[in-house]
Design a protein with these regions (language model features):
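A structural signal for short, well-ordered beta-strand segments and their strand-loop junctions
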Residues: 58-60, 139-142
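C-terminal interaction segment
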Residues: 2-32, 37, 46-49, 67-80, ...
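A short acidic/basic microdomain associated with nuclease active sites
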Residues: 55-68
Length: 219
């Protein structure tokens, strides 16, 4: 969320109003470009597909996180482009309300850079996620310039992650690599294999069947 938009929201909401936790909808504005949306949806789709048998995580994008110690919607909120919380119930949410989620903050956050948000993502948000959220893994990615960086929280401070020989960065929290593939950020297994989307999985299966002279449309 842009800082000016956040300030406008705060001015329009009474500081004394305490909202019921279950009524907190996300305040995040639309994503900046179609490519931003494609990248966010790709990360969510791939992780949910890979972890389809798991029910102990929550992955979302462009969703507001409310973290006010006073349990007020009007103060202390932020909406990462993509985040993952581990050790929680996998269910649909209107927003992530820290005081309604046993005090849990995201384990992984990724921000998608743009000309209007890049400096905030690199500086202010990095400090916020380090000092307040205490998020173990923080990444940012620019789908236009392909700038990609990652950090891991060590002794309370973010330390830059070193890329492997393929340029991938390791997420200790996800037990996966993140790396650029065909211009978009994707997951890779510890062995370096691309984590496929459901559509890619189906396409590869269909191709394999055709190699065996089996028409996939007949199955």
């Amino acid at each position: 969320m842009m800082i000016t938009q956040e300030l406008e929201l705060k001015e329009n909401i009474s500081q004394d109003v305490i909202f019921p936790p279950n009524d907190l909808y996300s305040d995040e504005p639309p994503v900046e470009t179609e490519l931003h949306l494609e990248q966010i949806m790709l990360l969510i789709k791939c992780l949910k597909w890979l972890w389809k048998d798991r029910y102990d995580f929550y992955a979302a994008g462009n969703l507001t996180i409310y973290y006010s110690p006073n349990q007020k919607k009007s103060e202390y909120f932020r909406g990462p482009d993509f985040f993952v919380v581990l050790g929680t119930e996998r269910k649909t949410r209107k927003s992530w309300v820290v005081w309604n989620e046993d005090g849990k903050y995201p384990n992984v956050i990724l921000e998608i850079l743009s000309p209007t948000t890049a400096n905030t993502d690199r500086e202010y948000k990095k400090e916020l996620y380090q000092n307040t959220f205490r998020t173990p893994d923080y990444f940012w990615f620019d789908p236009y310039t392909l700038e990609f960086a990652g950090f891991h929280l060590l002794d309370g401070k973010y330390q830059p992650l070193e890329a492997n020989e393929k340029g991938h960065l390791w997420s200790e929290q996800l037990n996966l690599y993140l790396g650029i593939h065909e211009g978009l950020l994707r997951y890779f297994t510890p062995e370096g294999k691309l984590v496929l989307t459901p559509e890619e999985t189906a396409e590869r299966l269909a191709a394999k069947l055709r190699e065996l002279n089996i028409d996939p449309n007949t199955i």
